[in-house]
Amino acid sequence: MSSPNDSHSGSDLLPRFLASVTQFVSSQPVVTLWIIGLFTLFSALVTARFLTFKTDRSDLIDSNSEFHQRWEEYVEKFGPEADIVIVVEGPNREAVEQAIDTVGAELRSESKLFGSILDRVDSDRVVSKGLQYLTPVELEKIENELDESQEIIEGDWNLAGLNAYSRRLEQLLQYSISQGDPARVDTAINRIELLANSLHSFLLDQNEFESPWPQIVSRTELVSQEAKSEYQLTPSGKMGFVVVTAQASSNGLTGKSESLNRLREICSETAEELSEVEIGMTGIPVLEADEMERSQIDMRNASLISFGGVGLILLLGFRGFRHPSLALIMLAVALVWALGYTTLTIGHLNILSVSFAAILIGLGIDFAIHYMARYLELRHHDEEFHRSLALTSRSVGTGIVTAAVTTSMAFLCATFTDFLGVAELGVIAGGGILLCAIATFTVLPALITLSDQNLSPQRLPTPFQGTLLRKMIRRFPALVTILTLVAIVIVGAQGFRLADGEIESIVEYDSNLLNLQAEGVESVELQERLFQETDGSLLYAVSISDSIEETRIRGEKFQQLDLVARVEDMASYLPRFPASETNLLIQSIHLRLSRLADLPETFPEINPLAVGQTLESLHNLVQSQTSPSADEAETRLDETLDIISTMELPQQVEILSAYQGAMLSALHAQLKKLKEVSDPSPVTPKDFDPAIHRRFVSDEGDWLIRVYPKEDIWEEKPLEAFIDQVRSVDPLITGTPIQNFEAARQIRNSYFDAAIYALVVVTLILLIDAISLGPLCVTLIAPLAVVGFTHFMSQHAGEESNIAHLLALYTIVAILVAFVFDFESTRNVILTLLPPIAGGFLMFGIFAMTNIDLNPANLIVLPLILGIGVDDGVHVTHDFRLTRGPYETSPSTINAVTLTSLTSMMGFGSMLVAAHQGLVSLGLVLVIGVGSCLFVSLVTLPAILTLIDRGRSQKPEKQVPPQKTEEPPEDEEDVVTIAFQNSETFGDKPSDDQ
């Protein structure tokens, strides 16, 4: 029985057009193939000349996105090159430092390949400006000290002798006591104690000299030491790092670059030369290159397995070699067309859209299988060759076109999403599917004509028919329907839970890109070890400021955040106080020290008696004080005097003269060192190693702040918390963590939105295909009033309307209206959507039961399963609509749906052998998804249709009078349906290509 809206009872413009095209192609196969060959050659040439590849992850993001515009601004100012981290591990600090020096020297010798080499912090030019790191108060103190010693600086070294210095200390203490200034008293006593300890130690051992002069440049010495060469090592000294950027960008689809290749050679050669150390590489460029290289190897291996597996399935399904070969040739031509189409529309492939070939292989071959199965079925019913091709196009052509359009629209809906990578994949895959459908009606009939036109039906293969399954469904449709629906509900429900009154998915989304990498990849393991050893991440957020003052303020705010481990910026390398506050003081100090005289060849003669008297006076003066320091100084002075008194005069002169010489040399050395760090010219970023200042200050004067996380932000929850915190300080912050977070959220939302949009569009297309023009207009126009009213009420309430909700509302109302005007056709539309909806529900349940999560690699399962499921549903329901008499799924439909699903499962399942975990997860979820849709399409849906057919066959008004076999049918299509009705099997006829 047929419904009123079956294709054969309504307008047959599309079937007639497809039949006409097929008749022309089969009558002129050589001419057709020549035209197709020229068009294919043109597509290949255009592709080879103009198609490019974009392997950067940032190419997947819409350039209009605010967060991506901030990233591009950062890249424009500071360069696109991310740091490569060379990790050196050895038994001790010396071995690690030697390896770092060797690697650094090799990198610097190849400047065309490597830039911004940071193996040591080497800023010698900053040493001469060390005073600028002191506070104004400390500088004033130094200036006062120099003011008191001005005569000594200018050459009167007699004033710095032992006796003279002792008298100065005595006068300083007397004056401080008279002024009643405890602070100055303590200062004087500390200096006396320093002199007493120094002299006492020297008298005991002339090889042990300690300077008696106060260290007025101690902070400067510290700064100078920090500014000298320093390796980047862990506290243990057994792990060190060299940071470098690659100058040569990646070439081609593999993501490899000359810089990375050479860098691996340098690391390998150095590790071989210095056998004690191990050298590895990590960093974002290395992680991405390793991922791309591994995935390319895996895809190549999977393609070989897929090709062989699909060929084997077609061989078993069609029981011969010839017809599977024709289908694969047609698919190859369509793929070349798709490449040309991609070149003309998009112009490039990215790391997501490069998978379009796998998608088209999985979906495009379906059209050829459906076409070939029906053609062979008709030939086995002794139809004439050219007539069988025309009837094939008339019977399954509508289903192929409907499936192609709905599947194409499912992908094209991705263009409405925010994620550019998904949108481009949607355009390429959507257009490619339509090209596969065109090739099915042009290339395939021409190839079949050249192959089969002189063959008798007895020499053609007999495809798989699914006889047992068809009989089971025909005999027990109610039982099969109930059992399968119950199973789908029970299993599918495992994927969801009820929490706080809302239904939530148990299947989670894993955004950690490291979990997609192959196990055992060196760069991933090094990154994890590096994080553990240093509590540092390779990922960091980037904040850009306009001035050093703003950089310091913002850096301090970042450092106060709980989730921030450390902050790096150029301001931390520069003096804390601006030159306007310190420059005059430093100029004064520099001017005084510029007069520093050399030490005299002979030092002032020493007078032991005078020295003893002065030290005795100091002893008595200190003895009058009661502080601990005074007690210590008094004790040391007493001991010193006792030692001197035991010596003969010549010995006293000799030892005290030696001490005085060492004392004057120490003062001169201290003043000289102070002079060396008193350069008054301001410290600038260019005083530092270019590898440092280029990373933190742009040529335009922008200042960069790197904010490192305390936790591992490859995981989504720590990443989101970290981003929330750093955005509280700088809402415009960017960097790889923000890019990863926003891109992962965009790709997740884009796939889900694309699936929703596609479901809405596919439903509307199916309604347009099923309902006649008059009711269709009402069906499409009536819901606009409801949607418009809902939108108006939302606006009136001050709420923003959700586009997805409005589209869903429009679709639901359209279906309800369509049910009123044409119940049977609308019911068929809903049943067509049963495989993707019920199959998807079943798929999520299996995911939950097997602990499979969605991730950025396998989210493509959503539009793919919708396309594959709708494709199966369209062919099964079209088969139902074409059937006259009691319904039973036709052998060609069973054969085609089974083969298309199995070939898709084989194609995607071949990825399970991959080492790249992203490809493994992609293959696994697609095998489960396609298998779920296959189960619903072959078992549940035919059983439901069989029940519907039995119900409608009991109504007398819908019975069709039996046709007279002696009268020819009025329509060519009736020949097909009558033949199907009168035959259950094709007959087992031998094939010449078995």
Give the location of each predicted region.
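A general structural motif
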Residues: 67, 514-528, 681-688, 748
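Short beta-strand elements
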Residues: 111-127, 275-283, 481, 565-571, ...
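Juxtamembrane segments of multi-pass membrane proteins
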Residues: 83, 477-601
